[in-house]
Amino acid sequence: MHLMYYLNDEGKRVYTLKKVSPDGRVTKSSHPARFSPDDKYSRQRYTLKKRFHVLLTQLPAKPY
């Protein structure tokens, strides 16, 4: 059993253990993808995040 989710009418995630939502759509896995040290595309992901300013070091600091 894996935790799954689907989006409701308001766009919020609804978590479930079922493979199909009540309206008949297939649910998505709520778990992140596995980490692999042999990741061939990490450089491309890093470059895209840097280009669009979404790296954690490029974001403004959170107020505490």
Curated annotation (Swiss-Prot):
Disulfide bonds: none
Molecular function in Gene Ontology: box H/ACA snoRNA binding; rRNA binding; telomerase RNA binding
UniProt-annotated location(s): Nucleus, Nucleolus
A GO cellular component entry from the record: box H/ACA snoRNP complex
Subunit-level organization: Component of the small nucleolar ribonucleoprotein particles containing H/ACA-type snoRNAs (H/ACA snoRNPs).
Chief location bin: nucleus
The keyword Metal-binding appears for this protein: no
Keywords: Nucleus, Ribonucleoprotein, Ribosome biogenesis, rRNA processing
PANTHER family, per the entry: H_ACA RIBONUCLEOPROTEIN COMPLEX SUBUNIT 3, RIBOSOME BIOGENESIS PROTEIN NOP10
This protein's name: H/ACA ribonucleoprotein complex subunit nop10
Superkingdom of the organism of origin: Eukaryota
Pfam families (UniProt xref): Nop10p (PF04135)
Function: Non-catalytic component of the H/ACA small nucleolar ribonucleoprotein (H/ACA snoRNP), which catalyzes pseudouridylation of rRNA and is required for ribosome biogenesis. This involves the isomerization of uridine such that the ribose is subsequently attached to C5, instead of the normal N1. Pseudouridine ('psi') residues may serve to stabilize the conformation of rRNAs. The H/ACA snoRNP complex also mediates pseudouridylation of other types of RNAs. The H/ACA snoRNP complex mediates pseudouridylation at position 93 in U2 snRNA.
